[in-house]
Amino acid sequence: MDLKYSASHCNLSSDMKLRRFHQHRGKGREEEYDASSLSLNNLSKLILPPLGVASYNQNHIRSSGWIISPMDSRYRCWEFYMVLLVAYSAWVYPFEVAFLNSSPKRNLCIADNIVDLFFAVDIVLTFFVAYIDERTQLLVREPKQIAVRYLSTWFLMDVASTIPFDAIGYLITGTSTLNITCNLLGLLRFWRLRRVKHLFTRLEKDIRYSYFWIRCFRLLSVTLFLVHCAGCSYYLIADRYPHQGKTWTDAIPNFTETSLSIRYIAAIYWSITTMTTVGYGDLHASNTIEMVFITVYMLFNLGLTAYLIGNMTNLVVEGTRRTMEFRNSIEAASNFVNRNRLPPRLKDQILAYMCLRFKAESLNQQHLIDQLPKSIYKSICQHLFLPSVEKVYLFKGVSREILLLLVSKMKAEYIPPREDVIMQNEAPDDVYIIVSGEVEIIDSEMERESVLGTLRCGDIFGEVGALCCRPQSYTFQTKSLSQLLRLKTSFLIETMQIKQQDNATMLKNFLQHHKKLSNLDIGDLKAQQNGENTDVVPPNIASNLIAVVTTGNAALLDELLKAKLSPDITDSKGKTPLHVAASRGYEDCVLVLLKHGCNIHIRDVNGNSALWEAIISKHYEIFRILYHFAAISDPHIAGDLLCEAAKQNNVEVMKALLKQGLNVDTEDHHGVTALQVAMAEDQMDMVNLLATNGADVVCVNTHNEFTPLEKLRVVEEEEEEERGRVSIYRGHPLERRERSCNEAGKLILLPPSLDDLKKIAGEKFGFDGSETMVTNEDGAEIDSIEVIRDNDKLYFVVNKII
């Protein structure tokens, strides 16, 4: 992602599909809302990408080339038409065999052949229809894979059910009356009924249709089909029975001479009364075959009744429990929308979200994952999410251990189009990583909204608010169906603190990334106020404020300082951001730091101020700026700089200072001039340089009653008299008492700073003073020289983090 901002407007780089601000009011946003992206027609055809899959084509609804998408509206119309032909075949074939004496009328024969022709076309068409792999849930469009799958599954049965056995029998025998073999082979046409089952299954999950009426129609269809088949079979037995006068049809006078419709109605009447266990007895079995058939039929009815009354209840409640809950939630949501008169945009968003959640439950299986051991759960998260997390700029170069900790706490979510994932100015509770889909960045100002750009696979958002502990700067809204990984901000911060090296790497990535966004306005940063001191800033950003100055990003530095981050924070060498900016020549950063009230007089562990860093680095413009501010608060600043240059015998720096207009006879805080220091140190080159530039050589020996060297010694003696004496010991006081340590301490004069005290202790005891902690006799840590009194006992603890 690459954002470029200017004072008047924002432009986005090409890799984010830049476009100018298009501003519109909130009401206009609803009016311009694209309903097609949330169309219920399209929602019923969505295929969710598997977890962790980024490169997934969401244009699967449309067919391309020779391959037909199973979700294509035209193909679904074809499927519905084929279901109507299946219903025709299922009704006509038993009727022809039973009532037309296996000699169908010419019109029905033509219709049957036309229907078979359509099914033959469908067989050919199936070789070009993509399918959803049951294992990966991906849409397979490869022609070879489609052909292999079809040939290895339903191809043979589809061909067998399409063969016109009656026409073949007529060609072989020369008669239209078919034998029992052809009749049995014709039963293969019932194989087509699976299409009806698939249609009902799909319609039950389509929220555009009433689930109740779809289920009722499905049960009614099953019942009527079985009644029709049983009636035709019962009539067929009577019609083919060799002994006329001994069949159930004899109960109706002149039954064989009545019309075809009367005979069919009588057969259906018997079938229904028998199925419903009414059994009036007017049409009863008259021979053994009929008795056997009725017995079998009654036994079958027992199972069918149990299916309709008992098992179907359990099947609907248990087998379709998720669907029922889904439909109930849809109905409740619709009632809620209507009752509260919500706009159509919100209604579609609610329904779209609920549909996607229903579909995503079968992919997430979170309830199953929660039951697994932690080790297996981590392995699953590693396999699903780690490749996506490794692409994120924030985690470049981070150790695998930290990445595994992060992915173990990530949750996958599917978000529908036009859904606000993060709202502007909301608390930074979560960070999101985009696995698939697109997310728009929207800046809301009053009632105006500006689309700044688009984030895609591998991008992260919400991290600025999380790491800077401030409200979110923008609204992040999905542009298309998106799979996101959600990570709690609190866990991200905790994980960053586990390993200091990884913490520094992530913050470095963060700062370098936003350096590319050179004028990035990250909003009015604010420190968290949860009952804590508001002056305390988050360590994960404050400790790396110097890194911002190192990049020279004055705009980001300004925004961070607005968040009340201290401009005087120091690194391990005591350098402040002003030291770094002055030494590197970043004038803009220097001006920003001065604007936020930084302390110009802070010195690092070597005693160097930012002014000294600027002059030795030859950044004279920065030196003049700093000197102007420093001279206002400290009239001796010029003398201090000249004396420091004289003490170090740095002729080049002395020349540079004099060129900047500093008075060569200016005294430092101790009333000593640079010439006096040079003479005391016996540095003749420096003395000659100062004398050449007009230093007052007369007052050098007439100043009071001392020579320059004597005066320095007198000053040092006076300072020593003012300082107290302290006893220093090595080790923690509690540990020394536990070990009954009798190691003697050392009595020293209290130096002016805590760093000097540590340095002296290191020289006395032979350790690195910068890596120690100073405590009193009770073990309380001392972090200021002002709290130390005369005759205090101080203890130095080595290798402790300060």
From Swiss-Prot:
Q: Which tissues express it?
A: Expressed mainly in the phloem tissues throughout the plant but also, at a lower level, in leaf epiderm, mesophyll and guard cells.
Q: What is its main location?
A: endoplasmic reticulum
State whether keyword Transferase applies. no
**For this protein, what is any one GO molecular function term?**
voltage-gated potassium channel activity
Q: Which residues cross the membrane?
A: 80-100, 110-130, 154-174, 184-204, 219-239, 289-309
Q: SUPFAM superfamilies given for it?
A: Ankyrin repeat, cAMP-binding domain-like, Voltage-gated potassium channels
The entry's a nucleoside 3',5'-cyclic phosphate-binding residues are: 394-513
Give the record's family classification: Belongs to the potassium channel family. Plant (TC 1.A.1.4) subfamily.
User: What is the recorded function of this protein according to its Swiss-Prot or TrEMBL entry?
Assistant: Highly selective and weak inward-rectifying potassium channel. Plays a role in both loading and unloading potassium into/from the phloem sap. Seems to control sugar loading into phloem via a voltage-dependent process. Blocked by physiological concentrations of external calcium and by external acidification. May interact with the cytoskeleton or with regulatory proteins. Dephosphorylation by PP2CA not only leads to the inhibition of potassium currents but also to an increase of the voltage-dependence of the channel.
Q: What is this protein called?
A: Potassium channel AKT2/3
Record gene name: AKT2
